[in-house]
């Protein structure tokens, strides 16, 4: 079994520098680099995937639009949405891209079912749905067997900006969130549910290496090696997820 580092970022994180940090991590990682999962919430932003078509952006208003290198069409990120960026070595995990996506979907659905939400994936479209409403979007990039980008799980957020786009390229697609079924709901409670399931379903050692990290620390990947940074300006705790 393999170790994984789970980094948790506080505050609302701007998209562009976080995306650049993911790219840098992926470009510089080697076969022995430990996999990482980054948990955070973004400042309001629309992101357009590589397959994105302009007609799916109905009215972005004053919310920034960033064209990225992930798969998929346009989606929205904002406060109250849990982002999980999956920086994994798929070859080491023995996963094809298709199996990787299905494992993500099944893990998210399993975590939502623990809250009594009847969530499931769809064969025809990536993501996790409750009936015909989408609750979790998935957009990935795999380079030389290394994945980055990840998933966006709607927890307790303002869903209004989704009406300004055709979410994931589907006209009229309705979005939903955990808060619509479990109210009140806390972000930390969602993390406590989903983390152990990810560790189990992807075959990682438990407990995970839990790290409180700042955006500035991640940006330093442009200048310093992982080994030089380890243990600096961050608090590392090996805590079991219950």
UniProtKB/Swiss-Prot annotation:
Catalytic residues (positions): 168 (acyl-thioester intermediate)
Enzyme class: transferase
The protein's name: Octanoyltransferase
Enzyme Commission number(s) from the entry: 2.3.1.181
A Gene Ontology term for the protein's cellular component: cytoplasm
Protein family according to the UniProt entry: Belongs to the LipB family.
Residues reported to bind substrate: 70-77, 137-139, 150-152
Domain of life of the source: Bacteria
Subcellular location: Cytoplasm
Classification via Pfam families: LplA-B_cat
Site (Lowers pKa of active site Cys): residue numbering on this chain: 134
Note from the entry: In the reaction, the free carboxyl group of octanoic acid is attached via an amide linkage to the epsilon-amino group of a specific lysine residue of lipoyl domains of lipoate-dependent enzymes.
GO terms assigned for molecular function: lipoyl(octanoyl) transferase activity
Main localization of the protein described in the UniProt heading: cytoplasm
InterPro entries assigned: aa-tRNA-synth_II/BPL/LPL, BPL_LPL_catalytic, Octanoyltransferase, Octanoyltransferase_CS
UniProt entry tagged with the keyword Phosphoprotein: no
Record's catalysed reaction(s): octanoyl-[ACP] + L-lysyl-[protein] = N(6)-octanoyl-L-lysyl-[protein] + holo-[ACP] + H(+)
Keyword rRNA processing among UniProt keywords: no
Pathway this chain belongs to: Protein modification; protein lipoylation via endogenous pathway; protein N(6)-(lipoyl)lysine from octanoyl-[acyl-carrier-protein]: step 1/2
Domain BPL/LPL catalytic residue range list: 31-206
């Amino acid at each position: 079994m393999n170790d994984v580092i789970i980094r948790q970022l506080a505050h609302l994180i701007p998209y562009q520098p976080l995306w650049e940090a993911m790219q840098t991590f992926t470009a510089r990682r080697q076969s022995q680099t430990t996999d990482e999962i980054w948990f955070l919430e973004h400042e309001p932003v629309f992101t357009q995937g590589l397959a994105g078509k302009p007609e799916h952006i109905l009215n972005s208003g004053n919310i920034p639009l960033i064209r990225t290198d992930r798969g998929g069409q346009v989606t929205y990120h904002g406060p109250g949405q849990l982002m999980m960026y999956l920086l994994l070595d798929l070859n080491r995990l023995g996963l094809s891209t298709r199996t990787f996506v299905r494992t993500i979907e099944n893990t998210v659905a399993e975590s939502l079912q623990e809250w009594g939400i009847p969530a499931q994936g769809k064969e025809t479209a990536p993501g996790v749905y409750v009936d015909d409403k989408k609750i979790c979007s998935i957009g990935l990039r795999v380079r030389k067997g290394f994945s980055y980008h990840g998933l966006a799980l709607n927890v307790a957020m303002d869903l209004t900006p989704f009406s300004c786009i055709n979410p994931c390229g589907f006209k009229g697609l309705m979005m939903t969130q955990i808060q619509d079924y479990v109210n009140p709901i806390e972000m930390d409670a969602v993390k406590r549910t989903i983390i152990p399931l990810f560790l189990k379903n992807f075959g990682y050692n438990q407990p995970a290496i839990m790290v409180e990290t700042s955006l500035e620390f991640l940006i330093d990947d442009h200048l310093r090696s992982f080994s030089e940074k380890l243990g600096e300006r961050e608090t590392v705790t090996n805590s079991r997820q219950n």
